[in-house]
UniProtKB/Swiss-Prot annotation:
UniProt: [4Fe-4S] cluster 2 binding residues: C204, C208, C211
Protein name (record): tRNA-2-methylthio-N(6)-dimethylallyladenosine synthase
EC number: 2.8.4.3
SMART domains: Elp3 (SM00729)
Reaction(s) catalysed (UniProt annotation): N(6)-dimethylallyladenosine(37) in tRNA + (sulfur carrier)-SH + AH2 + 2 S-adenosyl-L-methionine = 2-methylsulfanyl-N(6)-dimethylallyladenosine(37) in tRNA + (sulfur carrier)-H + 5'-deoxyadenosine + L-methionine + A + S-adenosyl-L-homocysteine + 2 H(+)
A Pfam family per the record: TRAM
InterPro entries registered for this protein in UniProt: Elp3/MiaA/NifB-like_rSAM (IPR006638), Methylthiotransferase (IPR005839), Methylthiotransferase_CS (IPR020612), Methylthiotransferase_N (IPR013848), Methylthiotransferase_N_sf (IPR038135), MiaB_methiolase (IPR006463), rSAM (IPR007197), rSAM_horseshoe (IPR023404)
TRAM domain residues: 425-493
Keywords: 4Fe-4S, Cytoplasm, Iron, Iron-sulfur, Metal-binding, S-adenosyl-L-methionine, Transferase, tRNA processing
Subunit description: Monomer.
Subcellular location: Cytoplasm
Note on how the cofactor is bound: Binds 2 [4Fe-4S] clusters. One cluster is coordinated with 3 cysteines and an exchangeable S-adenosyl-L-methionine.
Amino acid sequence: MSVTVFNPRIDDAAASDITAVTPAVTALNELSSAQAPVKSATKKVFVTTQGCQMNVYDSGKMLDVLGDSHGMEVTHDIDEADVLLMNTCSIREKAQEKVFSELGRWRKLKEKRPDLVIGVGGCVASQEGDNIQKRAPYVDMVFGPQTLHRLPELYDQSHQQREIAPKNRIGTVDVSFPSIEKFDFLPEPRVEGFKAFVSIMEGCSKYCSFCVVPYTRGEELSRPLDDVLAEIDSLAAQGVREINLLGQNVNGYRGEKDDGNICRFAELLHYVSHVDGVERIRYTTSHPLEFTDDIIDAYAQLPELVSHLHLPVQSGSNTILAAMKRNHTIDVYINQINKLKAIRPDIHLSSDFIIGFPGETDQDFQDTLTLAKELNFDHSYSFIYSKRPGTPAAELPDDVSFKTKKERLAEFQKVIIDSTLAKTHEMVGTTTRVLVEQVANRHPDCLIGTADNTRTVMFPYAVDKMDELLGKIVSVRITDFVSPHMVKGEIEAVLA
């Protein structure tokens, strides 16, 4: 598998500008759509993926469209690739420079192999556009998140230009926002494994002052209901048991039904729960502004909804939330969580936090610590604030020193780590639902899977019967703490 995955929330966790507490099980199985088999061909494509789950999903679709149109094969080895694709993310500090730094390394490969085709996609491509080819003229294709379905045409155009003017070649750029048409041109989803992402919408219309997403992915556009369900039907028929619904703000889903009426997100959850074969539903990411009562009620009505919610709050201070243009208060957020806990007492929570936002005082930070302690977040994706070009917050004075930001982040992370450890230890002696995914690499007499709360669960099982259990939902009694994100137990029953 050639897709190298970085999460903007967890990439380079040791770097000075970000620390993240994350589950041990990351995108291994969630990469399934990007692991699809493609037609046999001599051309090979290597993809490196930076960023969020949306980018992981998009990278899988890049491979799908090139496999479907040109029979390209995926390669792990960059040195044997005929096509190099970089799916970029603009969330991190100095994202553009990191892209050009990587492109500089790719340039050396192209100097040795002039026929190598290089493409840059994702949010940095959307931001930079023609500037990428001005600074890196050896790049053949530049495309945005909304135009990845046009990769086959861009690839053909790059070859045509090479034939016409091999020494004066001009690359192709398409970073337009053609509504949501890309989903109309994607091939049938193909998957290995028991988990899959399904994108239900693109873009975001919230315009938080720190965020580049509305400028790189456009405003919110929802896929029609039937299109979403057709993709899920296809994945379920291939053995997928867990669906993760994706969007920058899935709560804002407004998909059109075939009768012209609008399907909201809570209703979509009900539709997905009725798809044969789907046993678990996750979604990411959400916005508190639209985490409505009908979504909360779905947790009482749909056992398929896992007992885990990722609901970014960004800060525990109302003053900072106002400066971030989040358009909700801490009391609203806490009330939402309390309603959910009344329905699902075992719900596990995770969130996003930005530490050191412009104007953050000691009291603002203490308010954030108080919130983290009160709600006992299971884990957190936590950033030190850094300016994103083109955002309103970039115009604010960055008046919190880097030293203070680092100290605050370390203090905040200790609170989260303590909570993570406590919650994992609390699992010992309880029973949890687990999606069985594979044989444990280091313990061939054990199977491993993922609990609702994202913990990895390992349990012994008869070696000659392991295949029968893969893809099943089982009940496991937890007997031992292994690590902050891993436990061990004994199987009690097969549930589905």
